[in-house]
Structure formats: structure tokens, C-alpha cells
Amino acid sequence: MAKRQLNRRQNWRIEKIQGERAARAAKRESVTLETLEGGDLGPEQTGLVIAHFGVQVEVEAQEGEDVGKVFRCHLRANLPALVTGDRVVWRAGNQGIGVIVAQLPRTTELRRPDSRGQLKPVAANVDLIVIVFAPMPEPHANLIDRYLVAAEHAGIHPLLLLNKADLIDEQNAPALNALLAVYRTLGYPVLEVSAHQGDGMQSLQSQLDGHISVFVGQSGVGKSSLVNSLLPETDTRVGPLSEVSGQGTHTTTTARLFHFPRGGDLIDSPGIREFGLGHVSRADVEAGFIEFNDLIGTCRFRDCKHDREPGCALLKGLEDGRVQQQRMNSYRSIIASLPQDSY
């Protein structure tokens, strides 16, 4: 069923109601925080944000007698927006409640624009981004390349993961093999697994051990199933594919961090169909296509748009095979989606 279109007044009313609810929640949170800070709080200690629930977060103690225990914590008003994976300084209160007093510096930050175009952090301190796709819903190189550009821009190593490999058949195998060959040629690590049958899961686990990883990819590719296979004790819900669209129904409702037995962590984040790149510049996108590195800056014209200009190094690379047509199409699509002031 198509979504009902709302007029301007209806949208204003919805935003007004949501704003009033948020204000009431913030007031209740402020009262609770004042009560906590007016009571007995423990000493400052370091912690790890493992889940975020609106105005509260779950923090795992990283030191002291409570190490490994999880506390629901309130946030002081002067703190920046916290996300799963953040390292913080906090103080424990009574009955498993605590207060976060400071955010520690992040090594990396994965961000994307929200519905209003404002940058929103998704996860912090991640050093491996696992880009998940599957035979169904049909993978699109453009979406994979958007994730790769985001990973390169954030300084996070990517791993391409084809899940549901048991669904590969004679009909879809040629296109999938051609897709994977492009990324293998570029030097990106690529794994093929089946969370359902368990094939390749040990190889995936060895890639994840010792890293702080995040799974990204459109809904329906089996991210929740992968988490359940890697960490059977979790209760991540799995949703079916829509029979109409072939896309998945969203299941995970909040980003959560899980520990692996042999070390390393996994952040399972809500499924997203489109990963926006409105926060990057044209130069950032060009840097995100690693095969462009030796070509950018060698065009005849400094302001070359790599379209039809004579002496364009990228077009020459396309002719001699150093640049694949699939990747060039993705590059042009991403550039076309950027705001004009990003040029």
C-alpha cells in the first residue's frame, strides 16, 4: 500500500506533537538527572556505550569492581550526541542507574545525513565496515560503491560480504560473479557466506575477531541473521522479504554492540535502503574510488568534470581498462546526487 501523502498543515501538526513529546521527555530526564546528581554517585570511571535509547544509553563498565556490568545511564545536557561504540566517562548511581559526565575522543566516526540533511553519527570507534549484500534483494553496485566511499572517507577498512550464497543459481550467478570480480580486482576483500546454512561463517568470524565492526547494507540482506549465527545467544529479530518489493522489512530497532568470545565487537545497526553522501565533496567522492588515485589531477583541464572533456584521465582510464564502466557509472550517479555547493 502506498504511503499517504500529508499536506503542509498535517506535517506541521505532526512535528508540533513530536516536539511537545520530546520536550516533556527532556523535562522528565532533567528531573531524574538532578535527583541522581543530588544523591550518592560513585567515582568517575570509563565505560563503553553498547546501545542508545533516545535520551538514555546503556553503558558497559570497563574498569573497577563492576567491569562487564551494564548500566542504564542518563546524559548531562552539555554532552555531544553519543552513539553506540562511544567510550565515555561515567559515574554509577543506585539500582543500576548511572550518569555520563564526558565523552572520550573518537578514533573514527561513521556518519550519514538524516531526513533533514543534518549529519548524524551512526557508530563510533569502528575499524571495520562490513558491507552486506545478497542475491535477493538484487545487489546494486551503486549502493555498494556509496558504502565504499563512506568507508574510505571515514578511514575505516571495508569488507564486502555476499550473504545468502545458497541462493546463487544459474540465473543470477553470471551477474553476481561479474559484480564480485570488479571489487576483487580492485583489491577489496570479498567473502561469500550463508548465515542460513553456516557456509563460510568461520572465515567471516576470523575476519571480525579483534576488530570493532559494523554491518551495513539494505534491508533484507540478512544482517540480523548473520548476527544470530555469529552470536547465537542474542535475540535479534529477523524479518522476511516483502513479496511485493523484494526488499526486506526492518527488524533491528536500535544500534547495539555485541562482544565476540575471542575478542572484538560487532555493532548491529538498523537496516537502511539508501546511504546518503550529501556531507562529502566532489574531491571526497573521487578519493573514495581508489582506482582514481593515480589519475585524478592528471587531466588536461584542472576543472575537468570527467564527462566529455578532451584529455580527461578518467575517460582514458575507462578506455584502457584501468577504470571499469560499472564503477564509472556509480561515480557519476553519486556526483549527480551531491548538493551543488559540494562541487
Swiss-Prot record:
Zn(2+) binds at C299, C304, H306, C312. Signal peptide: none annotated. It is an enzyme of class 3 (hydrolase). It comes from the Bacteria. Keywords: Cytoplasm, GTP-binding, Hydrolase, Metal-binding, Nucleotide-binding, Ribosome biogenesis, RNA-binding, rRNA-binding, Zinc. It is found in: Cytoplasm. GO terms for molecular function: GTP binding; GTPase activity; metal ion binding; rRNA binding. Residues 116-275 form the CP-type G domain. It holds the Pfam family RsgA_GTPase. One of several proteins that assist in the late maturation steps of the functional core of the 30S ribosomal subunit. Helps release RbfA from mature subunits. May play a role in the assembly of ribosomal proteins into the subunit. Circularly permuted GTPase that catalyzes slow GTP hydrolysis, GTPase activity is stimulated by the 30S ribosomal subunit. Monomer. Associates with 30S ribosomal subunit, binds 16S rRNA. Belongs to the TRAFAC class YlqF/YawG GTPase family. RsgA subfamily. This is Small ribosomal subunit biogenesis GTPase RsgA. It comes from Pseudomonas syringae pv. tomato (strain ATCC BAA-871 / DC3000). The lineage of its organism: Bacteria, Pseudomonadati, Pseudomonadota, Gammaproteobacteria, Pseudomonadales. The gene is rsgA.
